[in-house]
Amino acid sequence: MDRIIDTAATREDEAIEVSIRPKRLADYLGQQPVREQMDIYIQATKARAEALDHVLIFGPPGLGKTTLSHVIAYELGVKLRVTSGPVIEKAGDLAALLTNLQPYDVLFIDEIHRLSPVVEEVLYPAMEDFQIDIMIGEGPAARSIKIDLPPFTLIGATTRTGLLTAPLRDRFGIVQRLEFYSPEDLARIVRRSAGILNIDCTTEGAAEIAQRARGTPRIANRLLRRVRDYAEVKAGGQITIEVAQAAMQMLKVDQGGFDELDRRLLHTIVEYFDGGPVGIESLAASLSEERGTLEDVVEPYLIQQGFLVRTARGRMATDKAYQHLALQPRERVSAFTDPEDLF
């Protein structure tokens, strides 16, 4: 399912993100508490001439976890090795990565929650003691040898902290949560990206794009590129607030950052299920969408923004959802009086 406001990175996103990615913490806009903390940790680490403690970065997709790892490595003045949990299939794959690190290098593992238990077992002593155990030979002749590793920093990124095992989670000395960005910070990001990409974008135009970007830089930059296309064809190339609004109308992204699927979901709960509660299976059937799509792609932002709530009996639209749909809230059944589980 292709959505302009999807947080998953496309190939175009990945190519563009490389060119607009900030290098220094000073250029990493937003996430002020994270920036301030990491600045202190990095300065202290460099003063002691040590490896930075292992870092876990978590939060919704598209908020800059990979970008932050690049910034950390740059500020430390070391190389960054990038991989992901699904790519490291065997213990030998991880051993090859670790033994090729130089002192104080940073190893970034995206989707670290998807590491297999066998690979995790190899990672534990590497993180704690900078050592790994390798099996040499097969059968009765097999034996284990220890290999010393140079001091290094592991940065793990995940959108699903609940799937991390406790032993792995406990081995990270620094844990950072990335939050959704404010419209003001997103507008600054849009203006910065526009400057790098040579896009003529007014301050008001950038603010209009930021307002509809769902608190996510990846979406903001994607919307910027699509609005640029519209501006070049329809408005002489300049993105003003009027051009941005017209482009968003064409893209069917409203002022709340909702697309057709978001509005359909809220409208279905309100119109067909009297505002809820409604079980996820019934909702998925009504929308002809997969349950996983609704749970992982559509609902998180609606819940975070207060348009939808999950209860023991199912999903309920809030008064805020009624207001967004320009409808009058109805008298609804309490979601907490009946223990029936509709999940």
From Swiss-Prot:
Keyword Cytoplasm: yes
Small ATPAse domain (RuvB-S), as annotated region: 182-252
Residues given in the record as DNA binding sites: 291, 310, 315
Record GO cellular component, one term: Holliday junction resolvase complex
InterPro entries: AAA+_ATPase, AAA_lid_4, DNA_helicase_Holl-junc_RuvB, P-loop_NTPase, RuvB-like_N, RuvB_C, WH-like_DNA-bd_sf, WH_DNA-bd_sf
Main location group: cytoplasm
Record-level Gene Ontology MF annotations: ATP binding; ATP hydrolysis activity; four-way junction DNA binding; four-way junction helicase activity
Region: Large ATPase domain (RuvB-L), residue numbers: 1-181
Entry function: The RuvA-RuvB-RuvC complex processes Holliday junction (HJ) DNA during genetic recombination and DNA repair, while the RuvA-RuvB complex plays an important role in the rescue of blocked DNA replication forks via replication fork reversal (RFR). RuvA specifically binds to HJ cruciform DNA, conferring on it an open structure. The RuvB hexamer acts as an ATP-dependent pump, pulling dsDNA into and through the RuvAB complex. RuvB forms 2 homohexamers on either side of HJ DNA bound by 1 or 2 RuvA tetramers; 4 subunits per hexamer contact DNA at a time.
Family the UniProt entry places it in: Belongs to the RuvB family.
NCBIfam families: PRK00080.1, ruvB
Record comment regarding domains: Has 3 domains, the large (RuvB-L) and small ATPase (RuvB-S) domains and the C-terminal head (RuvB-H) domain. The head domain binds DNA, while the ATPase domains jointly bind ATP, ADP or are empty depending on the state of the subunit in the translocation cycle. During a single DNA translocation step the structure of each domain remains the same, but their relative positions change.
HAMAP family in the record: DNA_HJ_migration_RuvB
Protein name: Holliday junction branch migration complex subunit RuvB
Organism of provenance: Xylella fastidiosa (strain M12)
Gene: ruvB
